């Protein structure tokens, strides 16, 4: 837990998907945002459960907090979002980047989602534009478009920068989604449909142009070498030490490295169920005539 001035950040690590979910809490107003939640999913049985989300709910209630926002940094391809479950339990507005609509169009077509699937973003309460300001209680926040990694031809990837209005830059926090990882692991892959290494490099530079003391909160930690979980870095640390994107690595070098590395990677285990659910803001597909919901597996299409 990081607590500075009115801004308090708590991370919750899910070892099954290597995902970190966050509570961003304004101690002054007792208001919070939840970022990148996880719906537990067993791909062998097709069963969902709520252990990870219930940890967030329990902690929010311990804090006595009111949920103002449930935020997604992007349409995740490696875990399912628990946003609807959290919203039902705690309230709050669901937000993502405005380019979710292009993601929905692309993947609605891939999964043949049908006419009942809305591809205009209406499943979300707020579609953030690049540079759009908003508040979490008395905390100031800004949404920055940081595409390059996620599926979709104009990805909905966002970085959310949050600060106490009266605090120094060292008290700012940026939730970077899958742009950067901890310095010893590097950066996100770019080989999903619509991903692009050159675009990601430029997005990373947006993040690394923030104040050097800005704390960066990762969406994942893959524990290279079996080390303990780590998910907080700073702009300065990433500039100095990131194995893929430190100072001195050119755009051309990054693109060549990223493209060469990505061709060696298999698809994430949960990419097909994740994208189908997350393009719907975490809602499961509608039940069919027999009352059962289904995840589709498009053959030879991804």
Listing of model-derived features with the role each one plays in the protein:
Residues 81-83, 159-160, 185, 227:
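Active-site-flanking alpha-helical
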Residues 94-124, 261:
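Acidic/polar short surface loop at catalytic or gating sites that assists cofactor/ion binding
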Residues 47, 106-109, 187-188, 227-232:
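Short aromatic-enriched loop/helix-cap "lid" or pocket-rim segments at secondary-structure transitions
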Residues 77, 103-104, 226:
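Generic structural signal for helix capping and beta-alpha/helix-loop junctions
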Residues 88, 110-117, 194, 234-235:
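Short, hinge-like loop/turn segments at secondary-structure boundaries
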Residues 1-67, 117-221, 299-302:
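Catalytic core of the metallo-beta-lactamase
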Residues 46-95:
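Active-site metal-binding motif and surrounding structural segment of the metallo-beta-lactamase
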């Amino acid at each position: 837990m990081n607590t500075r001035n009115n801004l308090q950040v708590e991370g919750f690590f899910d070892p099954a998907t290597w995902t970190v979910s966050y509570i961003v809490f304004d101690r002054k107003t007792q208001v919070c945002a939840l970022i990148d939640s996880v719906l537990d999913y067993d791909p062998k049985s097709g069963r969902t459960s709520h252990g990870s989300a219930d940890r967030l709910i329990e902690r929010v209630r311990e804090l006595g907090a009111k949920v103002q926002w449930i935020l997604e940094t992007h349409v995740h391809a490696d875990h399912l979002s628990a946003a609807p479950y959290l919203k039902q339990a705690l309230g709050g507005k669901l937000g993502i980047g405005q380019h979710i609509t292009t993601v929905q169009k692309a993947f609605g077509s891939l999964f043949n989602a049908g006419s009942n699937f809305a591809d205009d973003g209406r499943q979300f309460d707020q579609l953030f534009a690049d540079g759009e300001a908003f508040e979490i209680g008395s905390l100031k926040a800004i949404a920055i478009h940081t595409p390059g990694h996620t599926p979709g031809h104009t990805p909905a990837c966002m970085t959310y920068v949050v600060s106490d209005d009266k605090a120094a830059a060292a008290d700012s926090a940026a939730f970077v989604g899958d742009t950067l990882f901890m310095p010893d692991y590097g950066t996100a892959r770019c080989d999903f449909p619509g991903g692009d290494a050159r675009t990601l490099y430029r997005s990373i530079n947006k993040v690394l142009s923030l104040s050097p003391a800005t704390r960066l909160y990762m969406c994942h930690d893959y524990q290279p070498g079996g080390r303990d979980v780590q998910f907080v870095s700073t702009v300065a640390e990433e500039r100095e030490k990131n194995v893929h994107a430190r100072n001195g690595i050119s755009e051309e070098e990054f693109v060549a490295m990223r493209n060469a590395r990505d061709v060696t990677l298999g698809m994430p285990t949960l990419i097909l169920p994740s994208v189908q659910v997350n393009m719907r803001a975490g809602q499961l597909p509608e039940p069919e005539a027999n009352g059962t919901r289904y995840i589709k597996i498009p053959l030879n299409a991804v």
